[in-house]
Structures are given as structure tokens and as C-alpha cells.
Amino acid sequence: MITVALAKGALLKDSVARFAAAGLDFSAVLDKDNRQLMVPTPCGRARALLVRNGDVPTYVSYGQAQLGVVGFDVLKEHQLPVAQLVDLGFGGCRMAVAVQESSGYTRAADLPAHCRVASKFTQCAREYFDALDLPVELVHLNGSVELGPITGMSEAIVDLVATGRTLRENGLIAIEDLFHSTARLVGHPLSVRLDNGPLASIVDAIRAATPVGSFS
């Protein structure tokens, strides 16, 4: 039986729809009354593991799931050994540096050396500022990173931005993008290499169901 790690939250509905195109019905995970974390398909060919977004690469890299759907931002942050198979196009957002609108900063290089930068994505932030050759003190936060500049704890933040509404409502502005992120179909490398057909057929069907240029 093929095991697929699906992230709870914003990516779940589109993930289920994409697997449906491959003949796998995971719609039971969308039932608001569902409390099961391991949900088989009616056909018995596969089962879904409902996990946190950040845990998808872990389940896939350790082989507890042969396939998974996760945001590119998570892959960049955790850097676990998984095979990136298909850019699914949905869940589009960008990783950005943001500051208070009144700060006067217009690009990341304007930030003072050794200033504090708050983020949930400290690995991504570290790589970015290292590439700029700008030493900063990274402050790891698990939520509401916008409060960093508002309270004066940090000069800037690095966070995911979709519409930018949260930034605007808190007096912040994005000044530079690190990268664009979309949902990715990932696989356990050894399982993909040793596959004798079942995994490839699912991956091919999902790839065929992904419209070119429809990324959002």
C-alpha cells in the first residue's frame, strides 16, 4: 500500500483534488468530523497520513510515506533528503524581507549590520543574509513575527507573504523577496528509484493534471 503524507491546512483541499486526478480518493480527510490521522482510500491502494506541514518532509525522508505534498518554503527550511517530483503550482506565496513602512528601508542591504531579524524560517533567512554578506542576529519565533518590528524587538522579519494584507494591517512593507514558493509533490528517494510502476503512474497522472502556467 502506498502511503502519502498530506499537510493539514491551506494545501489540503488542492492536494486531495490533485490525487483524485491520479485515481486516489482521499476526500475523507476533508470531512470536518474526521478525527483519523491515517485514512485509507476506498480502493485500498493507498492511505493518507494527516500531518503538520513542517513534518511532511520528515515522514517522506524516513520512508514512512513514499509520497507527500509540502510547500517549497518548508523544503528550503528543513533541507531533508527527499526527491522533488512535481511543482504542483498551488499554494503560491513568496518568502520576503519586511520592515516597518516608516523605517525608510527600501532593500535588505539597507539594514544595519548586526540588527535583529525575526523569523520562523531562520535557515532560509541565514542563507539569504549570508549571501548578502550582511551579518544579522536571527530571532526564531513560532508565530506572529510581525510583532518583532512593531514591539522594537527586531528591525525586520523574514516571512511568507501571500496577499500582503497582514503586513499592511500591521504597518509593514515587503522590501525584498527571497524566493517564490508553491506546493511540491515529493517522494522518498529510494522508493522512487526502486519503484516498479505504481509510484510512477501516480506521479505521471499528477504531473499531467497540473496545468502549465497556472501557478498561484
From Swiss-Prot:
What EC number(s) does this enzyme carry? 2.4.2.17
Under the heading PROSITE patterns, the entry gives: ATP_P_PHORIBOSYLTR
Chief subcellular location equals: cytoplasm
Molecular-function annotations in GO = ATP binding; ATP phosphoribosyltransferase activity
A Pfam family this chain is assigned to: HisG
Keyword check for Repressor: no
Keywords on this record?
Amino-acid biosynthesis, ATP-binding, Cytoplasm, Glycosyltransferase, Histidine biosynthesis, Nucleotide-binding, Transferase
Extract the CDD domains matched here. PBP2_HisGs
State the reactions this protein catalyses: 1-(5-phospho-beta-D-ribosyl)-ATP + diphosphate = 5-phospho-alpha-D-ribose 1-diphosphate + ATP
Report the domain of life of the source organism.
Answer: Bacteria
Metabolic or biological pathway, per its Swiss-Prot or TrEMBL entry: Amino-acid biosynthesis; L-histidine biosynthesis; L-histidine from 5-phospho-alpha-D-ribose 1-diphosphate: step 1/9
Question: What is one term from the GO cellular component aspect held by the record?
Answer: cytoplasm
Report the locations given in the UniProt record: Cytoplasm
Q: GO BP, one example?
A: L-histidine biosynthetic process
Would the keyword Disulfide bond be found if you checked this record's keyword annotation?
Answer: no
What InterPro entries would the database entry show?
A: ATP_PRibTrfase_cat (IPR013820), ATP_PRibTrfase_CS (IPR018198), ATP_PRibTrfase_HisG (IPR001348), ATP_PRibTrfase_HisG_short (IPR024893)
The UniProt entry, under Gene3D superfamilies, shows: Periplasmic binding protein-like II (3.40.190.10)
Q: Which SUPFAM superfamilies match?
A: Periplasmic binding protein-like II
The record describes the protein's role as: Catalyzes the condensation of ATP and 5-phosphoribose 1-diphosphate to form N'-(5'-phosphoribosyl)-ATP (PR-ATP). Has a crucial role in the pathway because the rate of histidine biosynthesis seems to be controlled primarily by regulation of HisG enzymatic activity.
The UniProt similarity line reads: Belongs to the ATP phosphoribosyltransferase family. Short subfamily.
The record's comment about this protein's domains reads:
Lacks the C-terminal regulatory region which is replaced by HisZ.
How does the record describe its quaternary structure? Heteromultimer composed of HisG and HisZ subunits.
Question: Per its record, how is this protein called by name?
Answer: ATP phosphoribosyltransferase
- Organism for this UniProt entry: Synechococcus sp. (strain CC9605)
Q: What is the lineage of its organism?
A: Bacteria, Bacillati, Cyanobacteriota, Cyanophyceae, Synechococcales
